[in-house]
Amino acid sequence: MGKTYSSPVNPIPKAPKGLAIHHWLNFLQAAYRLQPGPSEFDFHQLRKFLKLAIKTPVWLNPINYSVLARLIPKNYPGRVHEIVAILIQETPAREAPPSAPPADDPQKPPPYPEHAQVEPQCLPVLHPHGAPATHRPWQMKDLQAIKQEVSSSAPGSPQFMQTVRLAVQQFDPTAKDLHDLLQYLCSSLVASLHHQQLETLIAQAETQGITGYNPLAGPLRVQANNPNQQGLRREYQNLWLSAFSALPGNTKDPTWAAILQGPEEPFCSFVERLNVALDNGLPEGTPKDPILRSLAYSNANKECQKLLQARGQTNSPLGEMLRACQTWTPRDKNKILMIQPKKTPPPNQPCFRCGQAGHWSRDCKQPRPPPGPCPLCQDPAHWKQDCPQLKADTKGSEDLLLDLPCEASHVRERKNLLRGGGLTSPRTILPLIPLSQQRQPILHVQVSFSNTSPVGVQALLDTGADITVLPAYLCPPDSNLQDTTVLGAGGPSTSKFKILPRPVHIHLPFRKQPVTLTSCLIDTNDQWTILGRDALQQCQSSLYLADQPSSVLPVQTPKLIGLEHLPPPPEVSQFPLNPERLQALTDLVSRALEAKHIEPYQGPGNNPIFPVKKPNGKWRFIHDLRATNSLTRDLASPSPGPPDLTSLPQDLPHLRTIDLTDAFFQIPLPAVFQPYFAFTLPQPNNHGPGTRYSWRVLPQGFKNSPTLFEQQLSHILAPVRKAFPNSLIIQYMDDILLASPALRELTALTDKVTNALTKEGLPMSLEKTQATPGSIHFLGQVISPDCITYETLPSIHVKSIWSLAELQSMLGELQWVSKGTPVLRSSLHQLYLALRGHRDPRDTIELTSTQVQALKTIQKALALNCRSRLVSQLPILALIILRPTGTTAVLFQTKQKWPLVWLHTPHPATSLRPWGQLLANAIITLDKYSLQHYGQICKSFHHNISNQALTYYLHTSDQSSVAILLQHSHRFHNLGAQPSGPWRSLLQVPQIFQNIDVLRPPFIISPVVIDHAPCLFSDGATSKAAFILWDKQVIHQQVLPLPSTCSAQAGELFGLLAGLQKSKPWPALNIFLDSKFLIGHLRRMALGAFLGPSTQCDLHARLFPLLQGKTVYVHHVRSHTLLQDPISRLNEATDALMLAPLLPLNPTTLHQITHCNPHALRNHGATASEAHAIVQACHTCKVINPQGRLPQGYIRRGHAPNVIWQGDVTHLHYKRYKYCLLVWVDTYSGVVSVSCRRKETGSDCVVSLLAAISILGKPHSINTDNGTAYLSQEFQQFCSSLSIKHSTHVPYNPTSSGLVERTNGILKTLISKYLLDNHHLPLETAISKSLWTINHLNVLPSCQKTRWQLHQAQPLPSIPENTLPPRASPKWYYYKIPGLTNPRWSGPVQSLKEAAGAALIPVGGSHLWIPWRLLKRGICPRPESNAVADPETKDHQLHG
């Protein structure tokens, strides 16, 4: 062995001549364990001693190390004594019984018989001291040398293991090198078994922990490929070697490993033979699927192997390999049962065999004469195959293999006959026998021997049998039967079959001439009549399964698919594809076209298509229907979701599953919707226009396809459900589960369902059908007689460093199995918290100690993941566990091993979660779940809330959940301190009995005000918070500044917390707040609640210790009511603490800003003399003409607001530009509206009038000059549309337009003053400031009101013509008639009524309202007393 390998830098010492390699490795492993390590001198002395020991007569095989130690001379140099002592210590002495095989016999594979001597266990591979740090890859000569050493030993035998160990020790291979070595040394069967065992060992090692292994760096196999990972690579080498010892026994040369596919044998028949052979010969516990999949490709004929290679399915699932071979094999066989050749008249020439005419030579019954003498016996009368010398000795003949394929050439090749002599080649059509899934290959044949009449019999056609088998009763009595050994699917047999060495004639129904066989097998038990390949090859017939082409099935066409509104079809361009993808896409489209799922199409609409490569190398057709889905209306799904399989009663023990293939491709698509499902197959390199197709059936990817299929399938199964009321049919998508109380009823139900599905044309997958007894796999779960488990459970590695993707994926798997995992929500919540706060998907998460402990808890709980099936006679009980992190609810039944379901519900995303509301929600959820899945509500609810807390909540809470809890209170059961019940043995979770402090009320709310307690008023805003503590007087008040990022709610919380901090000494407190949020928060806290995630979570948590144990009265105060009660005044005082004080304007400042009149200053706190002094001292008012010097005007005024307006346009120069000011003034109140424009047009006048109407209201009539803008057609039409009377006056006439002209002067004077104060003041600002001064500041001296107050006053009432108003206290006035130019005063007369702005004066037998400016007080002409009239008279001329 040492000569076969290349020498490393520090070569391993070679074995002495005559010593087996596996023995030498034992000495090397012992030498490497010396301390200190061995030297070259030690190895030299060891080799020298072993050379001498081998030649001694006491040398034993196997080696007895105790005897060997006695042969070592005393004072022998080196450390040979220590090496042999290590071997004696590691190898316990055993005596081999007589029945044990020799220990060095490499031909006996493991496991050995019970009493066989077991080879000493070799320690893990140790590399030599000073070995190089890098490994050496294999070379071909190295692999050949290793294979030559182990060629005569079975995998796993001692010699095999020692040889491989030495190779590993010399080359230090990586994981890839070990994989190459396994493929080179062992068969595909052994490699597959070794791979299964290695995966198991790696998983166990990763769980226990490996030195140097980093889970984040990839699998162990990937890390072991790194040549620098020397320690980790050696761990992998030991696992790889240990996998051989775990191989099942008898793995060398199994009988079923040599089963090959015949040249004409269908692939499905070949796979069926393999499957039967594996079922009969595979050791128990060995996985069958990988071996069957490996042999199905490696032992297939060349045609199927080439096909599977071209399709990329050499390692695909077995169903896909079968489908590929059945679909893509050449269709060169005619689907004809039996067809005879065309009859032609026999020739006139004599037959060259028998010399007689009247028949063809091929139909001659005489054997063809041999071409020459037999090469064995030189007899010219027979052929070589009929030579007696070949038949003389059959005892030493080789065993017959029944299941080996035929090696004959292709028998269906067309014969090329010479054309000449008037002879034509007969038209030969080969007989083919089509089979179906339900039909067995059986024919009625007749069997005869020489000098016997034919006997009819039913024969089974078997292309896997090499030789024909006949029953013994057909054999003539004088037959000479010979012993033989037959190797079949059940193993070798020496007694069941005999060989008959004489000709036998078999008459087939489709052949005139019989098939003549030189020999056949005789079944001594009269069980089998088989026509093998020897008979089928002579008649040139073959068996095949008739193809059943896929077609659009007779399923009902759906009436609604969501596109009935017929929107415009989408037009999404097809994107380019590389040649590989385009070729795969062309192949996929061809398959869909053959299956009649699509058809050529010419019309509008297009959606892109592309292929996706699966992990197994196959391609999948993807039609991007997102554009169509966006146009489609959602259909209401009849399915509420996947069923809970625990609802399957235990009294329905007999189960069967039915799986439908290509479910969505069975629903026909109406032609009107084809534009929405059209696509284009592009040409390579755009060499031509693409080919257009559209779906004939609803495709995958359409969002309503699952809903439509469920509706169709439910309609098909509805009659079956009515016919079998005692059975259950569970349907979800294309998976169907049947459950019945009796096997006979299940059989009838299965037949009924199968017939219904077959009638509608829905194909079923027979490979995936499962039935009891045994477990049933359905919807990812395993159904056992009394429980439900999941097919796969997530493997959790307890570690502190996780990537975000790993943790998210693991939690997703946990969510799938959470209904059966006995763990509380708190453990899951800890892991959910670890996902928060990350924005980069590539982040790495470091778990806290609490989260790592949660991982351990979940890992233990997964080992108990199991759920019980429903017992219909027992009630359903519920357990509710409330925790701050969420609610855990359990549904279970008494006397059962496992619960029905675990439900984990997170708390709602609110700042405070009252436990009473959570309990009510859990009750509603459990009742709904139980009623939906089990058909009954819960009998009782067990919860972890004390009776005292529940009673207090029901008596004091005003929440809506109180009504729900009272309704279900008769079903409540408190767990108590020491609970008793079925869950003590059922639920292995001790945390459910822990008390929750949060559920206890932290403080008590008093229903009335507490007399002896102080009062706390608090408030807050985004920048400040304040509180006042009052007890007969203000004890303390404080204003708190807040951070800039604070919200209003946080400000209110800050104020309340500061007030509570100051009120700590008092056991009771009255709290008055104007925040409904805080009032509700305190009331919920008093009842007991869980804190939720919020931005103010820390502030909410600080409330609990400050209120703990207090008695509190809470009162809500409405703010800004201006009431004078103490509560409102103290609340306003709290608000005032947060407001910055606003200093009122003094009269001097007000005049400096606005230049208002003295009456306005008196209205703002100045006396008459002070106001006059302020105006006189103003420099701006001195420079610019004061308002008092403007000329007076006399016009016709309105008697009420918005009766008569005057309008005018005045011009103003501002910064070298000329502006037009369109002024409107009400003649009753004098209120003004101004619009600044650049032009004076009809449109500008309309805009200005609209602006005035929006502020002052709509006038009854307007009065303007006769300018072109006011007389324009546009302005006149606008006034007519609003029913406004328009009249004109004489411009610049005091008696016609005096009011508006005076207003223009006042306005321009104020603007000039403002611009004098600030030259850069914008014109719009100056105009607005002027309007504020004129309308809202300046006070009219006649009525002591502003123009705006006068304009908003109540209008004067209308006076009836015939009735006089009631007389008031007499007042005498001199008056002038409005509108007249007479300067003389009339009167005095007594006023009948006075109002704001005018007085009612009798004039000439009628009554007129005279404005105050045309009135002056007079003295009664005949006073009744000596009272002197008021000598003060005032001119009521309006001033600005």
UniProtKB/Swiss-Prot annotation:
Q: Where is Mg(2+) 1 bound in this sequence?
A: D659, D734, D735
Q: How and how many cofactors are bound, per the record note?
A: Binds 2 magnesium ions for reverse transcriptase polymerase activity. Binds 2 magnesium ions for ribonuclease H (RNase H) activity.
Record's keyword terms, sorted = Aspartyl protease, Capsid protein, DNA integration, DNA recombination, DNA-binding, Endonuclease, Eukaryotic host gene expression shutoff by virus, Eukaryotic host translation shutoff by virus, Host gene expression shutoff by virus, Host-virus interaction, Hydrolase, Lipoprotein, Magnesium, Metal-binding, Multifunctional enzyme, Myristate, Nuclease, Nucleotidyltransferase, Protease, Repeat, RNA-directed DNA polymerase, Transferase, Viral genome integration, Viral nucleoprotein, Virion, Virus entry into host cell, Zinc, Zinc-finger
Q: Could you say which residues are annotated as the site Cleavage?
A: L123, P124, L337, M338, L430, P431, L553, P554, I561, G562, L1145, N1146
Pro residues: compositionally biased ranges? 98-113
Q: Which residues bind DNA?
A: 1371-1420
Identify which cofactors the protein needs according to its UniProt entry: Mg(2+)
Domain Integrase catalytic as annotated: residue spans? 1197-1366
Q: Which residues form the Peptidase A2 domain?
A: 457-535
UniProt cross-references to SMART domains, sorted A to Z:
ZnF_C2HC
Q: Where is the lipid attached (N-myristoyl glycine)?
A: G2
Domain Reverse transcriptase: from-to ranges: 593-783
Catalytic residues per the record?
D462 (for protease activity)
- UniProt xrefs under PROSITE patterns: ASP_PROT_RETROV, ASP_PROTEASE, INTEGRASE, INTEGRASE_DBD, RNASE_H_1, RT_POL, ZF_CCHC
Q: Which residues bind Mg(2+) 3?
A: D1208, D1265
Q: Please report a single Pfam family linked to this protein.
A: Gag_p19
Q: Which GO terms describe its molecular function?
A: aspartic-type endopeptidase activity; DNA binding; DNA-directed DNA polymerase activity; RNA stem-loop binding; RNA-directed DNA polymerase activity; RNA-DNA hybrid ribonuclease activity; structural molecule activity; zinc ion binding
Q: Which residues bind Mg(2+) 2?
A: D1019, E1052, D1074, D1135
Disordered: annotated segments:
93-117
User: What ranges of residues constitute the CCHC-type zinc fingers?
Assistant: 349-366, 372-389
Q: Where is this motif: PTAP/PSAP motif?
A: 98-101
Q: Miscellaneous notes for this chain?
A: The reverse transcriptase is an error-prone enzyme that lacks a proof-reading function. High mutations rate is a direct consequence of this characteristic. RT also displays frequent template switching leading to high recombination rate. Recombination mostly occurs between homologous regions of the two copackaged RNA genomes. If these two RNA molecules derive from different viral strains, reverse transcription will give rise to highly recombinated proviral DNAs.
The protein's name is Gag-Pro-Pol polyprotein
Report the source organism.
Human T-cell leukemia virus 3 (strain Pyl43) (HTLV-3)
Name the gene that codes for it: gag-pro-pol
